[in-house]
């Protein structure tokens, strides 16, 4: 296994995709991971993110807002979305350029993004809509492209260390 220190902080969505490929290559799955697994992981992470926002669906609970935890959960969504894009582009027919270009105009997003809408787009295989809504949600939550790239890099390094220890 390569050490995480051989890699550098991502600066683009394409860098995230490449780091995700490396992470996924090193993780030993108990069975082949299929698109349905990745979609379910994304849905789980979207719900975890929602639970960390100021407007969680858990209206019956009071929980102190933690911006760092919210960003970490948002970054987890990007991890699994990168995994999904890599999975879909394995045969070369799924074009990643759109996603790389959209990430570059990250701060320009302004539209409504709702968690259930994200889930519907994912289930309907509307990955472009999902990604646009994810970028919009990121902005609405007050995060920048650098916030996502920095958090992704930190968490990627931790995940690489977890391989073979916490993750068997």
Where are these regions (language model features)?
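Flexible "arm" and connector segments at domain edges
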Residues: 1-168
């Amino acid at each position: 296994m390569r050490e995480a220190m051989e890699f550098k902080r991502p600066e683009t969505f394409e860098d995230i995709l490449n780091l995700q490929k490396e992470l996924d290559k090193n993780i030993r799955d108990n069975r082949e991971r299929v698109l349905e697994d990745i979609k379910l992981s994304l849905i789980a992470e979207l719900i975890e993110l929602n639970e960390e926002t100021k407007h969680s669906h858990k209206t019956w609970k009071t929980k102190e807002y933690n911006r760092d935890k919210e960003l970490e959960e948002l970054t987890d969504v990007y991890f699994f979305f990168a995994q999904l894009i890599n999975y879909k582009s394995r045969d070369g027919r799924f074009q990643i350029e759109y996603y790389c270009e959209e990430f570059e105009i990250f701060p320009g997003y302004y539209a409504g993004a709702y968690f259930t809408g994200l889930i519907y787009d994912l289930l309907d295989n509307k990955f472009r809509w999902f990604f646009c809504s994810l970028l919009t949600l990121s902005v609405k939550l007050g995060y920048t492209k650098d916030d996502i790239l920095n958090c992704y890099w930190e968490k990627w390094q931790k995940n690489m260390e977890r391989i073979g220890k916490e993750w068997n």
